[in-house]
């Protein structure tokens, strides 16, 4: 409900947008790809994965032949039992990876999701702490006359614009994680087929590392939200109420946006953080 003051209502509207996106992230991060958007997207991805398995089997043979040609100097070497057995085992394991790739990837995601749930439970947070305007700041704004409130309009518009942009960047980053999961799952049979040949196996290793990093991004996002929640529980203080109203509001909004930038930056760089910490780059 509006307070009757345009400046206060504008700031509250921006903070409601921010709080709404935080609540959505908290819900999304605990959602599995099968449950996302009712599971309709996941069903399409499963069908694409199944269709690409046929191509994966064809590439399996191609990568296997290429691997044999490059690793074996001659046909005589291929006749050696240990070499033939090694190539056979590699082909069987690669075929199993293509056939059971969906189960392998969903299992890896469940492990990462279990870590996310553990972090959520350990933090003691059932929901994100809402960011609200302090009553002291509202009183300062409401006591300002019409002429003196003109600078406040510019400060409020600029601050609200920053908050809206940060909210959109933050939620788009979390949604992009789901899209990366879907894309990786859909094309999985292609890179997994590369395990059939030793020279091409680096493609499959890079793919699995990238998928593991995507799954573990959720841990960084949750940790960033938990840390920001601690910041939000102690909002920026009004240091000196004798300053001009525009200065007080600017100082408050500036510190608030800085805290928001820390959260958005951590979420935006979650993939890079995981790759550096876990060596998955």
Q: What would you call each of these model-derived segments?
A:
Residues 1-11, 81-101, 204-215, 270:
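Alpha-helical transmembrane segments and their helix-start/interface "positive-inside/aromatic belt" motifs
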Residues 1-59:
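Binding/recognition "hotspot" determinant
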Residues 5, 39-50, 75-87, 148, ...:
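Membrane-helix interfacial "entry" motifs
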Residues 48-55, 91-95, 172, 182, ...:
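Loop-to-transmembrane-helix entry motif
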Residues 54-66, 158, 163, 181:
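Hydrophobic alpha-helical transmembrane segments
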Residues 192-209, 273-279:
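Alpha-helical transmembrane segments
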């Amino acid at each position: 409900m509006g307070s009757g003051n345009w400046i206060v209502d504008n700031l509250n509207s921006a903070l409601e947008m921010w709080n709404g996106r935080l609540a959505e992230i908290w819900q999304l991060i605990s959602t599995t790809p099968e449950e996302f958007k009712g599971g309709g997207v996941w069903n399409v991805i499963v069908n694409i994965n199944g269709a690409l398995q046929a191509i994966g089997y064809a590439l399996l043979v191609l990568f296997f032949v290429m691997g044999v040609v490059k690793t074996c100097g001659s046909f005589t070497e291929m006749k050696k039992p240990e070499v033939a057995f090694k190539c056979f085992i590699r082909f069987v394991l690669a075929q199993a990876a293509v056939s059971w790739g969906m189960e392998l990837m969903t299992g890896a995601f469940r492990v990462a999701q279990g870590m996310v749930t553990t972090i959520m439970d350990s933090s003691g947070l059932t929901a994100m702490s809402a960011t609200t305007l302090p009553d002291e700041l509202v009183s300062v704004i409401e006591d300002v006359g019409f002429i003196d409130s003109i600078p406040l309009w510019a400060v409020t518009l600029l601050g609200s614009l920053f908050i809206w942009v940060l909210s959109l960047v933050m939620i788009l980053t979390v949604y992009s994680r789901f899209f990366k999961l879907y894309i990786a799952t859909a094309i999985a049979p292609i890179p997994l087929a590369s395990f059939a040949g030793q020279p091409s196996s680096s493609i499959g290793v890079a793919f699995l590392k990238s998928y593991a990093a995507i799954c573990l991004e959720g841990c960084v996002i949750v940790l960033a939200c938990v840390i920001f929640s601690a910041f939000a529980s102690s909002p920026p203080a009004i240091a000196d109420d004798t300053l001009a109203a525009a200065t007080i509001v600017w100082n408050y909004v500036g510190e608030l946006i800085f805290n928001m930038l820390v959260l958005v930056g951590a979420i935006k760089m979650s993939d890079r953080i995981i790759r550096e910490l876990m060596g998955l780059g």
